[in-house]
Amino acid sequence: MKNSCVLVTGATKGIGWAVSQRLADQGCHVVGLARHVADIDFPGYLYACDLANAGETEELLRVIREKYPVDAVVNCVGPAMPEPLGEVDLASLYQAFDLNVRVAVQAVQAFVPGMRARKSGRIVNLCGRVVHGQAGHTSYAAAKSALLGCTRTWALELAPYGVTVNAVSPGPVETGLFRAECPVGSDAEKTVLATIPMGRLAQADEVAAAVVFLLGDGAAFITGQEIGVDGGGSLAGR
């Protein structure tokens, strides 16, 4: 895994940041994409990109493909978008699929030709406990479920080329975004913790550990799988 070149989307916050740090610590060359890059001490090569803009995304991926021999792609972008069923509108539904699925498709399409040629590669998609169902998250659950379907489909398609494709599905994670919605000690936090058998939030670095494992040599024969990092929150009967 050392000296591998890994592209990470959503690389400057939360899980994407933790993944980038872990990869750099293991000697990987990290290429990060994020909307805001000013004043960030990133452990690799960082590029500004509005991933909501398909044209801008495609052009930057072309530039990166010509500059770096990307061995692996980690799709981290895709913020949670809670809304009750009665409040779902087409704009939010399309936005969820755009950020969670279209961006991943573009990123993978850009670098799969090189992986096929080298007969080696890794793709990890960040999905979430939401793929097992979560009230009030229609658009987000649908988009992440679609990404999980892509994961399994790509795994079958790329296995003959030695490329593995897997998903990591975290439950609630201790991030600034989470705390903005669920302050420590709030009723909102208590409601979330009640859904986690282990009684605490995941740390971003714990999720990153699962991602980095799937990128490593020890996971060379694992493909098409979903690893939950959710403290038991996706288990039936919880």
Regions inferred by a protein language model and the residue ranges of each:
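Conserved glycine-rich cofactor-binding loop
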Residues: 12-13
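Conserved NAD(P)H cofactor-binding loop of Rossmann-fold oxidoreductase domains
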Residues: 76-82, 232
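A conserved structural motif in NAD(P)-dependent oxidoreductases
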Residues: 196-207
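Substrate-binding pocket helix/loop in short-chain dehydrogenase/reductase
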Residues: 84-85, 92-97, 188, 192
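Short, small/polar-rich loop/turn modules that mediate ligand/substrate recognition or access, typified
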Residues: 159, 164, 222-224
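Catalytic loop of short-chain dehydrogenase/reductase
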Residues: 124-146, 151-160, 172
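Short C-terminal tail/terminal secondary-structure segment
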Residues: 212, 223-238
